[in-house]
Amino acid sequence: MNSWTGLSEQAAIKSRQEHGANFLPEKKATPFWLLFLQQFKSLVVILLLLASLLSFVVAIVSGLRSNWNFNHDLIIEWVQPFIILLTVFANSLIGSIQEFKAQKSASALKSLTKSFTRVFRNGELISINVSEVVVGDIIFVDAGDIIPADGKLLQVNNLRCLESFLTGESTPVDKTIDSNEKATILEQTNLVFSGAQVVYGSGVFQVEAVGIKTQVGKIAKTVDDSVTKLSPLQQKLEKIGKWFSWFGLGLFAVVFLVQTALLGFDNFTNNWSIALIGAIALVVAIIPEGLVTFINVIFALSVQKLTKQKAIIKYLSVIETLGSVQIICTDKTGTLTQNQMKVVDHFCFNSTTQTDLARALCLCNNASISKDANKTGDPTEIALLEWKDRSQLDLKTYYRVYEKAFDSIRKLMTVVVQKDNRFIVIVKGAPDVLLPLCNNVQNEVKNIENLLDQSAGQGLRTLAVALKVLYKFDQNDQKQIDELENNLEFLGFVSLQDPPRKESKEAILACKKANITPIMITGDHLKTATVIAKELGILTLDNQAVLGSELDEKKILDYRVFARVTPQQKLAIVSAWKEAGFTVSVTGDGVNDAPALIKSDVGCCMGITGVDIAKDASDLIISDDNFATIVNGIEEGRKTFLTCKRVLLNLFLTSIAGTVVVLLGLFILGQVFKTNLLQQGHDFQVFSPTQLLIINLFVHGFPAVALAVQPVKEKLMVGSFSTKNLFYNRQGFDLIWQSLFLSFLTLLFYSLGIIYAINNRDLQTSGDLINRAGSTCGFFILGASAALNSLNLMVDKPLLMTNPWFFKLVWIGSLASILVFLLIIFINPLGLVFNVLQDLTNHPVLISYSFGGVILYMGMNEVVKLIRLGYGNI
């Protein structure tokens, strides 16, 4: 590559001070207060606010009736709407905090995926952050780059840029160094614009505008990367939440009318408020208030964990899809291998010397190594520069006048360099492509191919080089350009070693255990790919490897290694697996990988070697370019989905059980104990709305967070894994019987508590005290059982047969929730607020009922697990 002087560091600093920095103002983040207000658009929140409003109405009416005599009942009625409001605000606060963090994460993602560009400074080509580009800089770009600033071209080599974001035209623009005074600025082919994609060739330009002074800055067209994508699970939960809400609203109306009728219209002025409170309790019981909030928190925690593990997730939804990946189409170089290229062997043809071979490979090269050993460019080209002492190659006497960039279809790179009055055409690329273009190897082709096979058989990459000399060259002569890569003289080839990563073999084995099929797609020689694939365990049979040129699209699913593949073939491979119903992940780092990355379910771009276009097309950026990181991401995706299911099962358990208890309590037990409970006009609902809110939101909070951070003991990477079904393997059946059994226990001990109170001299004087005695038992049983149910969900075998230390975080979360209940029922001020019996310590029978119900629930689960353990999957 020709050298340009560029700016000095002092000149760059001065230019930045004069013309500004190279960045566009980011889209203004939504302020926290607005995020908080947006939470109130949710149907669930609206229903809870309505419940709170109606509770206020009941409290006001009760106050008017009692002449504002704030006895126990009136205090409870006034506290209740505030508790509902507190719950709504707490839930909304958690949601808004999560969205605020998501905004920050989107901003952090931009900093984690910073773009770099190559610039000439002080006569050296170096890599700098795009934001450090200044007016006057001389920039080098090639295929895959994003133009970092507006500028005028100084040199082009078949440069084509996609500028559709400015012009609306989807066809790439051929760039020249010639200006057209009659054309508009956007039609000037000698100009490049910030944000344009280089889809072919290379070029050098001088920066004329940066930041907001660029064309894209003037029209304020900023790209917002923080797009919100909902995963299939999140979409299901939104629908479930709406269904619960509408169902709850319908039941609210029915229950209010039916209960009013049961209580009697003759005393409607008193009975309507009792019926209304019962209907409100039912709505609160049905709606799983923490549904979306808990799941979003779990997803966010997983994203943070993966970021620390070098996997940068663009969208929360990617986590779930990762967990269901069945096919990984991976590159070889840099992903499965170390990407630490080194020339380990060479072959010089005829009279070619090592110096001739090295010089040709350095001249046909776009990498650079600065004086302070900073390396810029493709690892293969850097390895070629490092092979020999460049100071002995006399490279500065050659001046590049033309370049035909490498592409994955031709598999060649061509440059024309001038020395004195000679123009030397140098072509490097795949040996099997280059040899037929040479006219001096007719009788030696077989011998050369044998040598190449020997190198490939050792897992080495081979790169050949050839040249020819011209005494006249005109890059505007299309006929001469078309003939550049013909009638060449073969110089020889080099063999490069890029050993597999140590962790790749373990990751491949992990994939196979998890029923994930790893597939290698590479541009390398078939034998080289086969050797590496066998070493890593990807390939077991030779007939599972195929050349792209020999690929039969009907048999794509039969192969595990694809060599010498074009971008179109890579896209066809991905499409074939997707059409067969598989969830496919693809890795890529080049501009030509973008279609396959977009087509796949999870596109993974390499963070180190990946070009900007590939990063834009991907869902996940692997910042260490390591295949094992993808496998870690899949495992985390599986864990996240499993955790979400456990949290949902627990939420649905209390929603179903709570709804059954409230309904049966209103229409059956209420009638059974009507005489006792209606003394002094008191209602007879099993639970108050505030008790149900504590169970549905706060009690689930501790176990939900614990489940999210607790390492799982399941062998997640053994066997297939599906995220299509929310519940499977008995889970739906278990949810139903557990909910009904818990409902039965809650109602049973509620009834026993009432019977005890009726027969107790201290309690029988008040219908309210009688109801609270039963309600306290039911409240503790439902809440504590739900808290401990998180432990049930962790293992299929009885808890008594497991080591508690394995799930210590879930134990802590569950016990923390139970502690909340104990505080409520044993501390008088809290008991008053949540309508439980205040002097519970004086009634050990009720305490035994409360703990007995929980023990029976957990005991039944242990018995069922024990039976299944002994008699198989029933």
UniProtKB/Swiss-Prot annotation:
Q: Which reactions fall under this protein's catalytic activity?
A: ATP + H2O = ADP + phosphate + H(+)
Q: Which residues form the active site?
A: 331
What positions does the entry give for Mg(2+) binding?
A: 589, 593
Query: What's the top EC group for this one?
Result: translocase
Q: Where in the cell is it found?
A: Cell membrane
Q: Could you tell me the superkingdom of the organism this chain comes from?
A: Bacteria
Q: What is its EC number?
A: 7.2.2.-
Q: Which GO terms describe its cellular component?
A: membrane; plasma membrane
Membrane topology reported for the UniProt record: Multi-pass membrane protein
Q: Which UniProt keywords apply?
A: ATP-binding, Cell membrane, Magnesium, Membrane, Metal-binding, Nucleotide-binding, Phosphoprotein, Translocase, Transmembrane, Transmembrane helix
One GO-annotated biological process of the protein: monoatomic ion transmembrane transport
Query: Where does the chain cross the membrane?
Result: 42-62, 80-100, 238-257, 276-293, 645-664, 688-708, 727-749, 771-790, 804-826, 845-865
Which segments does the topology annotation call Cytoplasmic?
1-41, 101-237, 294-644, 709-726, 791-803, 866-874
**InterPro entries, alphabetically?**
ATPase_P-typ_cation-transptr_C, ATPase_P-typ_cation-transptr_N, ATPase_P-typ_cyto_dom_N, ATPase_P-typ_P_site, ATPase_P-typ_TM_dom_sf, ATPase_P-typ_transduc_dom_A_sf, HAD-like_sf, HAD_sf
What the entry lists under PROSITE patterns is as follows: ATPASE_E1_E2
Q: Which residues lie on this side of the membrane: Extracellular?
A: 63-79, 258-275, 665-687, 750-770, 827-844
Name assigned to this protein: Probable cation-transporting P-type ATPase
Q: Which gene encodes it?
A: pacL
